[in-house]
Amino acid sequence: MKCTSVNIRNVLDISLKKKIKENTNLSDDEIIIIYKRFNYISSNGKLNYDNFEKSLGILGSIQNAYLYKSIFKAFDLNNDNYLDFYEFCVAINIMLKGNKKDKLKLSYRIVNAGFNSNEDACVHKSSCMVNKFNTKEDNNMNGDNINGDNNNNHNNINGDNNNNHNNINGDNNNNNHNNINGDNNNNHNNINGDNNNNNHNNINGDNNNNHNNINGDNNNNHNNSHNNNSHNNNNKAENSLGQPLNEKNINDPINKHRNSQSIIYNINDEYNEKIKKNKKQDYSNYITYENFEKIVLSINDIKRQLLGTGDEIITSQIKYTFRSLSILCDDGIYRMNFECYKKALKCNEFLKLLGIHTKVADVFLQHELLKRKDKNKTKNGTMRNRKKYKNDSNRIANHLIIKSFSESTNTRGSIINDSTSFLFLRKQKKKKKKKKKKKKKKEKKAILYERKSTFSSSMENKSQNKSQNKSHNKNIKSVSRILSRVNKLSSTELIPNECDHKPNEEVKSTSDVLTPIFFNNGDEKMNHDTDGNMVYHKNNVDDNLVDGDVVSQGKRCSFFSSCENKKNEENKSITFNDINSGNINTNSCIMNNMIVTKESNEEIINEEAQSSYIYNKNIFCSKYNTKKDKNEPLKCDLFECSFINNDKNIVRDEDSNHKNVRKTDDYFIIDDNNIFDNGPIIISKNKTNDRERKLLKTFSSSSLKKKSLLKNYNYHIKKKNKDPNVEDTNMLYHDDIKKEYDHKVTKNNKNTCNNNYYNNVSFNSSAYYEYHSDIDLIHFSNNLKKKKKKNVTSPRPSSKEYERKVTYHKECCSNERMKNIKVNESDLGMFCVNNDKTNIEDVKEKKACDVLNRGCIKEQVQCKISEFENDKGNEIYMQEFKKCIEKYKEYVNQGEGHLKDEEEEKNDDEEEGEDGEDDEEENDDDDDDEDGDDDEDGDDDNDDNDDNDDNDDNDDNDDNDDNDDNDDNDDNDEKSNIKIENKKDVPNIHNNNDDDGINCCTNLFKDDDTLSALEKNVTNNNLIKIMSAKYLYHKFLEYKDFMKNNTTLFSHFNKIYQHEDDKINTDNKDVLNYRPKHNNDINYYNIPCEDQIKSDEKKSLLNVEFGDDIIKKKFFISSVNSHYVMINNNLTKEQMLYLIRNILMSIEDYLKKEKNRDYNKIFFLFFSIFIYNTQNGGDQKEMHEDEKWDHTNINEDKNVEKNDDYKNLSNNENSVYYNTMLRESLWNKKKYIKLNIFKNIILVISIVRYFLHTITISQKYTSSYDSLDDSNMIKSMNSLKLNEINILLNRASEILEKYSLGSVENKKVYINKSNYYNSSKKGKLSVSLRQNKQKKTFHRILAVYFGHERWDLVMNMMIGIRISSIKKFSINDISNYFHHKDVIQLPTSNAQHKVIFKNYAPIIFKNIRNFYGIKSKEYLTSVGPEQVISNMVLGNLSTLSELLSEGKSGSLFYFTSNGKYIIKTVCRNIHNLSKKLLPKYYEHIKKNPDSLLTRLYGIHSIKYQNNLGRKKKKIYFIVMNNFFSSIVEIHRRYDIKGSLVGRTVPETKREDHTIALKDVDIDELGDIINIGPENKERLLKVLKADADFLKENMLLDYSLLFGIHYRELSKDVVNWEETKTNQINHIYDYKGNCIASRPFHQCDYGGIISVDKKKIFFFGIIDIFTKWSIKKKFEHTFRTIQKFDGKNISCIHPNAYAKRFVTFIENHMK
């Protein structure tokens, strides 16, 4: 019997309904609908797993899938093996209406095999509801043994972390499992005796002699239920990440203490506190590796069985990802708690395993581990058991470790975007008393260190000095909460076998110096934690040392280091000597994973002939003072650690390099997409099974691309490979790197990098091939050729030189922090060379922040600033620094009073008045004014960005990289169509590409009268760059004058300006009074800093620290390549870092529009760090004229006209001279100064970032390795200097990425769904229609959830399309392509209910998709069900519901996740008509590639059994394009038919931009399609051709879907000055047939940019399948009589309809 709503209300219990409403967001109607569906899929009000599996529809055809079981367990809150209605409502509410937190908890339970923790289970408002409901439904007060589940799970359901059954019922917590099991017989007897106060048996009144009578179980089960091993059931089954676990010794008193939870009375508080510390941590609610692996494999198996395809999943890949995102528990097993899982869901690699696909994740996983198939199967040594250390109560052990990925800046959730930048550690308890710590110092003990690791390629050490004042502690309070008490965070360094302490090394006591290296005695059971409290070791682990060739590789070793904070004491570094006397100065031994004993002047590691490599990370350390025989092998435990013997050539020398390299095609191309990302990942390639023969290849995690590159890029690679000695240029060998850097040092001023490498970043990946059409590739290829012609002026270098350039380009632009490794000719092994002269400087610098953490980088920078300021040695410097800034502000404000904060608001109002409208939705994080915002948008799309979907990241400041006169472009080069510059008019300006990291408004001067004159000579982009460079130089002169006038006040600042001699001053005067008489001999102002550097015999500290390759590095100013800056080598390293930190903080404050922002401070800091300089070049004359105008008050126009030299200039020079005048007249205007400030601030941070990046690739730093191989986990973090630089580099990258628009991350893809408004009609007929509509809407509430009819429909549609699209057909067997029909039977959970899927004309539609450039992979992933299956794991189905909408005809619209395609259900008549018109439609779009008609990508039907009845139901649907899918938002849309009767929307509805306005509204609002005469003619031609096609086929009632994106409302990145409508849009074959199309009206972000550059228009003709039939004729007659207007009504004859349609649109075009 079909239930009505009334019957359901009567059946549903009122109290249950009230309970559901209190704890969910469901309405009464929704509860009733869900109840109806629940009763249909369940039996007797209880839904078991079998019925739940059937409710999944086609997904449930995969029986007993682990994923479905986990989902079922997650829904089952009370663990009774079935779902009642309450649990079902809670689950549906979370998946459809729940907030992000509830969905996250549900997802956590799903992945954790349905385990319900205290937080997770209570998703409703009252946690006690679960117990009450369980008591009512289950009649079980305890439920401990009902499900046979682990006891630990049950305890967590009720919010108790203790493993005690008494807590289940809220009884006294005095009983304990261990005591029950024989730990204390007296206690056990009391439990079962007369004293029933603490007994479970009293609860149910059962026999008191048996503890397990609560559940009515056998009395003999007492020991089993309370056996101590029951707490370890999960641990026994877990062999996480290949680590065998030790069985715990029950008789061991230490274990008993760890597992004990009893409270011992009559003892002192100190002993009781020790007992609490020794409690065992409960990890039962943590996700284990086994659970995660099962989920991943289950998802992949479901996709493989349903779709016939599945991703290639490697177990080691899952292992590596899980381990990198999890924490190491005190029992030596990696687990993932809720916080870890929360962060992991932001990691692309983690989401990829769960089936959430993004381009970044695809690139990462396709290359990360698939190349490891040749990996050595026999691993060196087995994974040993970890030692169990005691820790504080309810805390994870101090040696928690997190493996890390490298960072990535991809916008879709890359690893650096919060996914791996947090530390997964619990809160630390307060520090212990100092007295206890002093007592423990005297004993022989070991200090355990709590280690942390971030997801970055670098680590930073931070020593929190206790002597710091309280104000400083407040500043770092938020940091200290996360970072805890980490004294030193060491990083692995190259450690030779010959590793001694220097005999003359001054070493302080072991408490204040680096923890000595010692041998860990296996018999010793006593150790100490960081607070000096005694903890115990268990002597049940076998640890061995691998020492060169003496000990086999099967053995393991680990070195540990630790150090301790001391008041007023400095840590000394221990120096290790290799056999070649190369010193490696370290602060914390630079060995992460080693335990060695210290003997003051004795050898630590046996001397061997060759040095060895240690590569591992993140192990805690301990120390022990007992002297051992130095030859005694080390005993330690290690998760994964091993040695590589250097006697086997890891890196070949120059003679054997090319001979020993194996030939392989398995190489990777370094992509330049994110140049400054942190964290190299090292992939090791095995030629044989010997580990020693591995070759290390470096590449970035975000740069892992497929082999397929664009042809033009491969052309360069082939050119490089002409050298016969080079077999694989993508392999970066260490000796080659050495050569490259030697080449770089010797030819410092030569630019070896061509800028057009930086302009094609986003195209150098296979993702461009897969997700873009052939048209995009052709545009890219053409532009690349044009740029090549434009930029290549000098003859092509030899193959060797070109190889050096390209390889150096790869090295500079990759994300890795590559540091050279020098190869010793006498020793083929690798060793580091550190030229640091003093250990004191190392010690001071290495007191850095604890962790490189994206979430707290700002706090770390502020922390270091405070530390520098509080240093007593910097008092004088800080006093002068503060005075100098104050004086500078006063000095500058005298000349720039118009830029004060009071005047800025006036300027904003003026600019708003010029624009005509006030932008109320402007982002606060953008520029300072509207012009600045437009400036950012304008320069976003660079010249090579022909594809709208893949724009380059404009954050790259690569135009500052080593520009040189050798790269000057030839004046006679062929003129390019790309708008960069007019070379004929500006002959001396070169390399002015738009990829300079500065986004500016290309339409800034649209209201200026001088714009027309400027456009004739120089493009707007170039003009703005020159203006900004001119303003920067003006600020420099201002700074220089200030420093000269205050030389006596500030003795510590920029001595370069304080000690200039009279000759220099004379030269400066000559410069200011310059007249252009000698054009060829311009002697520009040149600061003699280079001469001082060369002549200064005693180098400063910066020279010692960084070397000449950094000190002499030139950072060129954008657009004026003769101007550059160099680092001020008179600064000390600490001063330089302090100034950089200050400039980063100041820039961010300014860009955030803080109240106290000050741009003058930014320029002051910048010129204090860098010295502005010039060199003789073509741009000097232009800038020199600007200087003259800067320092003269004479009227420019009159002087220029009277100047005889100006009259004698040639035409080109004349235009340059005139343009320079115009620039001067523009840049000094008030409204443009703020633009110049913003552009220069972005330039400043770009230069700072590139300078920091240059340090990381400097010769003085070795490479950072991070191998993905389990046995080769390398984490050589080099030194703390690099880590400090990386912190600042990350901070600079974050600021530049956030505030300089143009990044891919800032892009959004808008689906831009339309809502339909139908005016209500009066009369009885309209009333009945409204009632029917309400009923339909009522039944469509919550259309998608388990068991619902729409769920089956959507799943069947997506899976049917997915399967049919990959099916291959034999063309010879198909007689008629248009009438071909492919029939597929989809799997179902019920064999009797068959689902038939039909795909019509599959070959034709595949050709149509190819015609419009749709790749098969992109189409399948868009319409396929992969995302839905994965979203089930994430506890989220709301996305599916949001993508579903109802059309005005009642049709179901499903938008794909990327918004490009729409699946629309249609009636049978439309279905038949579409098939009938398909041949004509196909021919029409072939002849008219720019057609506006809806693009059909597929016609399908599904026939299935209706769940609500026994009749079979057939659904027809089509797949078509979404005209409004764009990276910009549609602010207004119209649905135009040409009719005026009833074609309007009320004003109250017009505010909703998702509602399509109509014909009358466009006249009232006055919107005009102003696309220019050329585009108007083309559009009208296409429109008439489409109208004729529709007229010929007697079609009507179609409409033009017309959308508008307004510039004034835009928050998206748009290059308004460049349109692509005139580019090549179609490809024709030799017969003249179009084989590929890209309509011109979709070239500009999916539309056409208007002539006034203020709008983007989108067009498309929809609803084209309405036939002129008898029904329409009758409607025409009826409406004519009703409205008394036969012409303006909608339903008219197709001929008249087409004519009216075209005429109406033409009248609204301009």
UniProtKB/Swiss-Prot annotation:
Q: Where is this region: Disordered?
A: 139-255, 427-479, 895-993
Which segments show compositional bias classed as Basic and acidic residues? 974-987
Gene Ontology cellular-component annotations: plasma membrane
Compositional bias, Acidic residues, is annotated for: 902-973
Activity regulation info: Catalytic activity is increase by myristoylated ARF1. Phosphatidic acid has no effect on catalytic activity.
Domain EF-hand positions: 68-98
The Polar residues compositionally biased stretches are 236-248
Q: Which UniProt keywords apply?
A: ATP-binding, Calcium, Kinase, Lipid metabolism, Metal-binding, Nucleotide-binding, Transferase
Q: Name one GO biological process term.
A: phosphatidylinositol phosphate biosynthetic process
Q: Does the keyword Lipid metabolism apply?
A: yes
Q: What reactions does this protein catalyze?
A: a 1,2-diacyl-sn-glycero-3-phospho-(1D-myo-inositol 4-phosphate) + ATP = a 1,2-diacyl-sn-glycero-3-phospho-(1D-myo-inositol-4,5-bisphosphate) + ADP + H(+)
Q: Where is the PIPK domain?
A: 1334-1709
The residue ranges crossing the membrane are none
Q: Where is the composition biased (Low complexity)?
A: 140-235, 456-468
Write down the EC number: 2.7.1.68
Q: Which amino acids does the record list as binding Ca(2+)?
A: 76, 78, 80, 82, 87
Q: Which organism is it from?
A: Plasmodium falciparum (isolate 3D7)
Task: Return the Basic residues bias intervals.
Answer: 427-444
Specify the domain of life of the species encoding this protein: Eukaryota
Function of this protein?
Catalyzes the phosphorylation of phosphatidylinositol 4-phosphate (PtdIns(4)P/PI4P) to form phosphatidylinositol 4,5-bisphosphate (PtdIns(4,5)P2/PIP2), a lipid second messenger that regulates several cellular processes.
* Coiled-coil features, chain-numbered ranges: none
UniProt KW Nucleotide-binding keyword: yes
**A Gene Ontology molecular-function term?**
ATP binding
Q: What class of enzyme is it?
A: transferase
Q: Which Gene3D superfamilies match?
A: 2-Layer Sandwich, EF-hand, Phosphatidylinositol Phosphate Kinase II Beta
Under which name does UniProt file this protein? Phosphatidylinositol 4-phosphate 5-kinase
